[in-house]
Amino acid sequence: GNFNYTLKGSTVLVIIGFLILLLIESRFHMKAPARVAKRAALILLSIVLIYGYTGMIQSESFVRSFGLYDKLFTPTVMNKRDGNIVAFLMELEYMDVEKPSGYSPEETGSKYTQAGQDSAGLTAAVEDPESVKRPNIIVIMDEAFSDLAVRGDFTTNEDYMPFIHRLQQGAENTRTGYLNVSVLGGNTANTEFEFLTGNTIGFLPQGSVAYQQYVQKETPSLASYLKELDYHTVAIHPYYASGWDRDRVYPLLGFDEFLSQDDFTNPKRIRNYISDESSFAKIIELYENKKEGKPLFVFNVTMQNHSGYEEEFHNFTPDITVDGIDSKALSMYLSLVKQTDSALQGLIDYFSQADEDTMIVFFG
């Protein structure tokens, strides 16, 4: 088959424990005074079995082998499919985070000192912080956006991201590059968490979602830092506000305001989602209505390009095809990317003519 089965220590512990329980129950018939010892032994073995069983349930290989549902985004589905006990034991894994090796104030301080020495001369000292310009900062984390050309060459009937390709050729006031993220095909909130806080999910238990498990109090982030610099901080996500607990988490990260799909009036939709064009128009609306003299920070997590890509929709017809590849999903995806490219051009063109300095950061 396609599975490789390995016996972990916790699995062996459970098997041995069950065998001992069977042996005690079948071979020993104790008199009343000795029953206390028997019960104590059974309680101890039960604790050992629970510990071992929990370890098995929390094993990634066990979860995959038995097809358990482990997506924390939908805990009700998790409970329904796996059962309440299994779901509860699986979630216990995320209650504790082990401190990474070498993590201490002394070690961290020395690394900051070294980083400062390495960057000496790259930044100029600011004598008067009040004189420093505070540009508006717009960050767009575009759902599922990527340039598939990094995976290999292919030919399309037309360019699917002409504007971004022009930017990559050295446009004025532009820096481009490639970004690796820690998630693939899900757990969008973990990329948000890493970008906003500078932390890494590499230090968290496998499968955890930082927003849901670990952001339970005010947490330093880019938003809270800019808020201290008198920025008005706004998060935008044109979908359900409760997704990944954003409505609870964003205020803890320092956002003054959170706009979800309920804050859009008659937006343009592509497939089932609010388009990037409408999402970017909301940014422009915020800029045009902001308080004069107060800089704006916007963090926009879009929805337009969310999977899946196989369905047909009355409000969107894919117009990008790939030579030699007959794939509805590929055609749909590249056509959506083209829509994003056009929307991004409109946003950048607008702020290129705006009165205030504005920095736009875009990544997928």
PLM ranges: what are they?
Residues 120-135, 139-142, 147-364:
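Solvent-exposed soluble domains appended to multi-pass membrane proteins
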Residues 1-134, 155-171, 175-176, 212, ...:
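N-terminal secretory/membrane-targeting segments
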